[in-house]
A protein has these predicted regions:
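Acidic, mature catalytic/reactive cores of soluble proteins
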Residues: 1-585
Length: 585
């Protein structure tokens, strides 16, 4: 049967902080990019079950299966058949472009492997050498090496039967055949025999650092999802630079069959800052700081301080392209690679960034960090002070530029946090006047009939207003905010979840947005409406499968996540909501 979003409840996510993979409970690798998150996929079964490549290990007989994590980022699949069972541990070796499928089976299994190069199947030259299967891109840029360590026999052009017992199936990536000759021959069964244990130890070291426990609280049921949220964010982190991508996938649609299909495998400043903040709030200061250091290193002193998004190595993304060779998930076209949002002006992102910097500083009192980046902080604040009246695309990346209230609020947040940070190291807060001017502008231009509207002369209320008290722009009990909150609850709160808005230039907004539900939970916690905050978390928890992964959008009718998966900033705001509820109650 064709994949649908309902299947995502049984999808697992693994990472080695270079790249990542999604795997279903049928032993099928749905998505894998080598050598890093934002590379072209080597397997894109998600986007085309006929032409997206295949890497499947499953019983030959009819089977049932279950998924669970052996350890963070080590995914265990158990198959049961009438003649016996099989267990597979799937993992990516930290620091290596090597995917291992560790098998212990009472029955024979079938292996299918046929990868993609340049988004095309069969776009390779195949050869075998010393028991290894070589798949070389026809353009010479990339070699995949498949090795079966254990008893097996070839049953077809790209199929093998794996005999019962202990087996390792190893998939390695090299940039070229020449690099394989230099490096690949060092990869052998002997030095991979302890790969599973070392990978478990690698992620276990993170687990040992978790200090927050929900045991004994009325949030106890959320402990597994809290831990999963942490490891999802860590799994979206690119270890060479510390940058954090938004999500591991591309072109999973908001609406099946529609065209809201985007590539999220990049470092959005906004998303990365929110995730860095969540890491710091959980006590993972080094990882949060590295993400912030990466963003500081991106500052452009010749214009707007930050682009909206970057590749994991800090290079820029130039537009997007359509991939005609893939049919798209549930026939959702176009399949997009790259992202045009890089060309937009988004004025909120520096606010999210500096708010995360301030959160790190408040937790660590690391004055040296602030001193080292004081010039960047001052430049951001000065540029925003000079340009705050510009129109922009806003947080929702709309094609129509407006003077969005949320963007102005986040500029205010940037100037507020810049003032506090620079004052903390003995500097002068010289942005007070501009902050007051911005606040007065929002009050004068973005309030209509006693409630906040999305932009001047608009009648629309969107869910960004929920963030205003979270970021300290307005008191949560302010009468204007309370009236706006009631409108959000009446018009955007549907079947237990919150929509961003009702309409945009593409059409009606068909799905709720998990971020907005988490904002509302944090608002309720500030208002001491704890039970309602908890219910929002329970609503999200009811959607997740056994692997505790959260998507970006929710189809409130079919009760499934849609869009790219798993979504990093949603996991981050789930963490933030948990901590807000604990702090405010």
């Amino acid at each position: 049967m064709a994949l649908t979003f309902a299947d995502f409840k049984d999808v697992g996510f693994i990472s080695n902080q270079l790249t990542s993979s999604l795997i279903d409970k049928n032993g099928n690798v749905l998505w894998l990019c080598f050598p890093r998150f934002d590379s072209d996929p080597s397997l894109a079964y998600l986007l085309d079950e006929s032409n997206g490549g295949v890497f499947r290990i499953s019983p030959i007989l009819q089977f049932s299966s279950l998924h669970k994590y052996t350890a963070p980022n080590v995914l265990h699949t158990n198959f049961k058949t009438s003649e016996g069972s099989a267990d597979i541990n799937d993992f990516l070796i930290p620091g290596k472009t090597i995917f291992v499928r560790d098998i212990n089976s009472e029955i024979n299994l079938q292996l299918n492997f046929n990868p993609l190069f340049s988004f095309h199947s069969m776009n390779f030259n195949y050869s075998e050498n010393d028991g290894k299967m070589m798949f070389d891109s026809k353009n010479g840029k990339g070699r995949l090496v498949l090795e079966i360590i254990g008893k097996s026999k070839k049953t077809g052009e790209f199929t093998w039967e794996i005999e019962k017992g202990l087996t390792q199936v190893i998939l390695s990536y090299y940039q070229s055949a020449e690099i394989y000759e230099l490096e690949g021959k060092n990869v052998s069964s002997s030095n991979l025999s302890k790969a599973l244990d070392s990978t478990i130890d690698y992620w276990g070291a993170y687990a040992e650092r978790i200090k927050l426990s929900l045991s004994g609280t009325d949030l106890e049921e959320f402990e597994p999802l809290l831990r999963s949220s942490l490891f999802t964010i860590l799994g979206l982190t690119y270890s060479p630079t510390g940058s954090i991508i938004a999500a591991p996938t591309a072109s999973l649609p908001e609406d099946p069959g529609g065209n809201r299909n985007w590539d999220y495998r990049y470092v959005w400043v906004r998303d990365s800052a929110i995730m860095a903040s969540a890491l710091c709030r959980l006590g993972f200061y080094m990882e949060g700081r590295r993400a912030l250091e990466f963003l500081f290193s991106m500052i452009d002193y010749s214009g707007k301080p930050l682009y909206n998004l970057y590749k994991v190595d800090g290079t820029k993304i130039y537009g997007e392209r359509y991939i005609d060779s893939l049919n798209g998930f549930m026939n959702s076209k176009p399949v997009r690679i790259g992202n045009r949002a890089t060309n937009q002006i988004q004025l909120d992102i520096e606010g999210e960034f500096l708010y995360a910097v301030a959160g790190y500083f408040d937790s660590t009192h690391d004055k040296e960090f602030i001193q080292n980046h004081s010039k960047a902080i001052e430049y951001i604040a000065d540029w925003l002070s000079d340009n705050w009246q510009l129109a922009d695309s806003g947080i929702w990346e709309k094609p129509e530029d407006h003077e969005y209230a949320h963007s102005k609020v986040m500029i205010w947040v940037a100037l507020e946090t810049a003032g506090k940070l620079i004052s903390a190291i003995g500097g002068l807060d010289r942005w007070k006047e501009t902050r007051n001017e911005i606040k007065n502008w929002v009050i004068s231009n973005c309030i209509k009939d006693g409630y906040f509207v999305t932009f001047p002369k608009s009648n629309e209320v969107d869910s960004t207003v929920l963030s205003f008290p979270i970021y300290g722009f307005i008191d949560v009990n302010d009468s204007v905010f309370i009236k706006t909150l009631k409108i959000v609850e009446k018009t955007l709160f549907v079947k237990g979840f919150v929509y961003r808005y009702n309409f945009d230039s593409i059409g009606k907004s068909n799905h709720a947005f998990v971020l907005c539900s988490m904002w509302l939970a944090s608002v309720y916690s500030q208002l001491k409406r704890k039970n309602e905050a908890l219910q929002l978390l329970k609503n999200v928890k009811s959607m997740v499968g056994p692997n505790n992964l959260i998507g970006e959008d929710i189809d409130v009718h079919d009760k499934v996540f849609t869009g790219n998966f798993p979504q990093g900033f949603v996991h981050a705001t789930f963490i933030n909501s948990i901590i807000d509820i604990l702090s405010n109650n």
